[in-house]
Amino acid sequence: MKKTLLASSLAVGLGIVAGNAGHEAHASEADLNKASLAQMAQSNDQTLNQKPIEAGAYNYTFDYEGFTYHFESDGTHFAWNYHATGANGADMSAQAPATNNVAPSADQANQVQSQEVEAPQNAQTQQPQASTSNNSQVTATPTESKASEGSSVNVNDHLKQIAQRESGGNIHAVNPTSGAAGKYQFLQSTWDSVAPAKYKGVSPANAPESVQDAAAVKLYNTGGAGHWVTA
């Protein structure tokens, strides 16, 4: 767009599917309809969030019309993302919020900017609000930026809301299903694309709050809020 254009804005989501057997191949080795998959990803087709593109395990990466697309599954969970080809910044992907978060509110359930989600989700959570776009690259109306508590980084009000919805503001939160971690529930691949060099490869949950805030701001400014399910 782990929805790793980051399915959490975007750090690069996962869905639950049945089956264990599968294969791993580059897209060039597989009979994929690249044009169709690219169009579905660009339009945030909910089919990609509800089920894998095929049964079993797979790992496909391909370039199409200026973007790099990635689809993967281990036979149990599945994920997908895309980003501008050759871009070193954030990708457009999303992830499910950590399971130790507070229960979602009614207004959370209506807010979906998901590229990467834990499946299945009910019909209500698949409907975007009338005031938001269904495009994963949507950006929020500029809001006043203020340093968050425990951090000297200026974080705008929209990002603060995202952090509360993703982790309840817990910088050590970890989603045991998707592996998303930290205050903003970064997938590792997304985190590595925006984190400082010394924190690449380190779990976001182990980074200081100011580092997490700075990474989230970078992701938000380059990819918009579409990375986060709760944006």
UniProtKB/Swiss-Prot annotation:
Region (Disordered): 93-153
The protein's name: Probable transglycosylase SceD
Keyword Metal-binding: no
Alphabetized UniProt keyword annotations: Glycosidase, Hydrolase, Secreted, Signal
Induction or repression: Positively regulated by sigma B factor.
Enzyme class: hydrolase
The protein's Enzyme Commission number: 3.2.-.-
Location of the protein in the cell: Secreted
GO molecular function, one term: hydrolase activity, acting on glycosyl bonds
Function: Is able to cleave peptidoglycan and affects clumping and separation of bacterial cells.
Matching InterPro entries: Lysozyme-like_dom_sf, RPF
Lineage, uppermost ranks: Bacteria, Bacillati, Bacillota, Bacilli, Bacillales
Principal location listed in the UniProt entry: secreted
Keyword Hydrolase: yes
